[in-house]
Amino acid sequence: ARARIEMPDQWDEVLPASDAFYLTDFSLFKRFYVTEGRENGLDQVEIRDYATNTAKRLDFPEASYVAGLDDNPEYDVDTLRMSYESMVTPETVFDYRLADGHREILKVQEIPSGFDPALYATQRLIITARDGTPIPVSILHRRDFPLDGSRPLYLYGYGAYGIAIEPGFGTTRLSLVDRGFAFAIAHIRGGDDLGQQWYKDGKLEKRTNTFNDFVDVAKGLIALGYTSAGKIATSGGSAGGELMGAIVNSDPDLWGAVAAHVPFVDVLNTMLDETLPLTPGEWPEWGNPIED
């Protein structure tokens, strides 16, 4: 909303609330403003005219990616400095020219060991959880990866505190992928990958949605031929370690390797001990069993 300086109590709605578009940031410039957010779990950047409030949404070339504004310190500009990356595209900084949409690449993250993006593919899958909820999955593999269930897969998820897991570039994954693995990110409930409701649907009394989503994604990837039961590696730390503890007990036959780093697996006793310095601040996430 906006208001005139002389009438600060009178607000005009500029950008209405939306269940589809999850606003994460905005930036103001002289002739326009820019909104950043996610729709269906994918980053969206929109340039909006002050006078008409019409929006131009920028297009990005890959099915799964991370995109947004970079450093733009000037107020009166004709170009926007932006950044883009994906699971197969190293971090790229470019200028977007407002007049005609031309994109000038300024810098691409250097990979000292060498990297040929043409050898790899990234996809965005939708796998249906047991309650009918569609779960987005970002996946990376070599282009010659066979969908016959013969290959191992590394599956990552977090699903807590409203933290989205972005499908960005990571050099450490390439070693696994070059040795025949697929690498997948399950955008499970408990993060805010698809907005605040996505986060709320994976906390408190709905916490089991997070665990079920992760297991169902693993089973869905098996059904699609990306891997087989017993060939999935996974890991998680802290709240992600809690996820590891849950899934290795509920479906032990799915996993070939599970690493739980500093896992938060004694939730009940921790939430019952209010003398622990972190416990009261964690009650909104896990619940307060002392009172309820």
Language model regions located:
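C-terminal substrate/ligand-recognition segments
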Residues: 21-40, 127-136, 162, 181-188, ...
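Active-site-proximal cap/loop segments of hydrolase catalytic domains
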Residues: 179, 185-292
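Non-catalytic accessory segments flanking enzyme active sites
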Residues: 24-25, 36, 42-48, 52-149, ...
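Surface loop/turn motifs at the tips and blade-to-blade linkers of beta-strand repeat domains
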Residues: 14-19, 59-63
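Helix-coil-helix junctions within alpha-helical repeat/solenoid scaffolds
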Residues: 1-10, 16
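Alpha-helix capping and helix-loop boundary segments enriched in small/acidic/polar residues
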Residues: 21, 68, 160, 164-167, ...
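Glycine-rich His-Gly loop
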Residues: 85, 156-162, 203, 238
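Hydrophobic beta-strand anchors of alpha/beta hydrolase catalytic cores
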Residues: 152-156, 183
